[in-house]
Amino acid sequence: MTNSIEDVCEQAQVILLVGSNPEEAHPVMGMRIRQAVERGAKLIVVDPRDIGLASKADIHLKLRPGTNVAFANGMAHAIIAQGLADKEFVENRTEGFEEFAVMVADYTPEKVAEICGIDADDLVQAATMYAKADRAPIIYCLGVAEHSTGTEGVMSMSNMAMLVGKLGR
């Protein structure tokens, strides 16, 4: 998670929930996310399961299990392709952007749709919604972290947040 609970519940405009079922695993947080959605925050659920919060989601991307990294790289591709990266943040606070952009260039929405079993247009819509929001935390949990590609999954979520300058926002 890239933000405090207060940031998520009181400030978020978009919440990107990846591989996490907070209503079951963290009920207080789940309730607070539900309240944030009720106050107008947009919700993107990325989970193969029909978790409770999926019914409140603006977009539900039901990835094939094990495809979190491809999903995140596809989001990054769409963000870069649309010119939505936070150039100032990337230039001043990150390194290796050029190499990263080359790496995600192969993760077109169509390719990611095939890998993940999702709709390419939904991926682009999610990337756009996430990138354009001023305050959009990523909340991930065991569905990302406790996987054979967990380290890469967590790094991919961090890369996505840094790409749009949303660490702490």
Predicted regions and their residues:
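Cofactor-pocket helix-loop regions in the catalytic cores of large enzyme subunits
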Residues: 1-169
